[in-house]
Amino acid sequence: MKPINVGLLGIGTVGGGTYTVLTRNQEGNRAPCRPPNCHHARRDRNLELARKVTGGQIDVTDDAFAVVVRPRHRHRGRIDRRIHHRARTGYEGDRERQARVAANKALMLAWQRDFRRVAQQKGVIVAFEAAVAGGIPIIKAVAAGAGRQPSSRVLRAIINGTTNFILSEMREKGLAFADVLKEAQPRLCEATRPSTSRAWTAHKLMILAAIGFGIPMQFDKAYVEGISKLDALDIRYAEELGYRQAAWHAPSAPARGVELARAPDPDPRETPDRQCQRRHNAVLVSDACRSHLVYRPDACRRHASAVVADIVDGTRTAYHRRAPAVPHLLSSPTSSWTCRFAIGEVSSAYYLRLRAVDKPGRDGHVTRILATGSLHRCDDSEGNRRQAERRRSGRHHHPDHVTVEKNMDDAIVAIEALPAISGSVTRLRMEELSR
């Protein structure tokens, strides 16, 4: 076998891990990949760091195009997040008939049509296993096995290790969001840019939905909601009700379209994915027979395994001269699925927390508003004692039956207008696998 040469664009966390795995396993598994020729193109262009990681064993340069047009390179790992610069190198690589392995989700969304067109013309692979869920091989699993099945709930994912870490700290230590965020910022890069982290998570969600349902990648159709307004009280109350707070990102397929939501949801503690805590990721796939598969690796590890998996696939394709097993980005122009446009059309049960003063008829007014909107208050028999304690402190929470979100929005506006209610109402969606 003639070895395959690999060029890495970026050698930070992901790129460095990829280099280490390829170099370490070269002799052990006899993989037909030579140690990668590395290009370091991070914003700081820190070539000294690149030389330190590689130990001076490979060529290092700060010119991305020198790696792209190098005839020896059959594979390119693309790690840097500078979108337009990487798009240019992507075009050049496709023209040079190089297989491209990308960990850059924003790049896949922003330039998907152009990359797909050029890649198909040149007959090269565009692989992006590492772009979702921190190294879980979920793209191959969904594309080859569980995707496009007529299930009401196909994919649910915890695909932001930083968010999951913050929620775990809030639950275990009872800290406020701002305190945990400040503690996490020196250690976790995504914690320093919360708004960017939310966008990255929505990118991952959109990729999963596109693969699962064969829809075009429509990032502007994804609903994104952070956890900054979540209080430690909500996490504690969820535990008392038998739920555990998680930042679920769930593309689902009801009859009218595909729902896309990135939002914090209380989830029953007995579900198979509830052991995913701290910086771990998890993806849960439900099939048409209501069975559940959970993919749950350690998100603290490098994405290298996912990048290397794509490189190995590309190597097999090159030697056997067959078409790629995973179609480029998997969006079908003839797909009948559409993204549902408004979050107000989503159906869910809801948890409400509100602060109220002690006035006669207070609970009756709230119940009447919920009943007017065809909403039903659910009493928690096991939590009656705790509810009594919360009534004395002026805090209530009401788990409700399934309803359309726009009805709940109207009810919340009416509840907040009551004289006995102080401040705004906290609302969380409560999801269960049986729905």
Curated annotation (Swiss-Prot):
Disulfide bonds: none annotated. Residues 262-274, 377-391 have a biased composition (Basic and acidic residues). Residues 255-274, 377-402 are annotated as: Disordered. Pathway: Amino-acid biosynthesis; L-methionine biosynthesis via de novo pathway; L-homoserine from L-aspartate: step 3/3; Amino-acid biosynthesis; L-threonine biosynthesis; L-threonine from L-aspartate: step 3/5. NADPH binds at T13, V14, R43, K105. The keyword Amino-acid biosynthesis applies. Belongs to the homoserine dehydrogenase family. Catalyzes the conversion of L-aspartate-beta-semialdehyde (L-Asa) to L-homoserine (L-Hse), the third step in the biosynthesis of threonine and methionine from aspartate. This is Homoserine dehydrogenase. It comes from Methylobacillus glycogenes. The gene is hom.
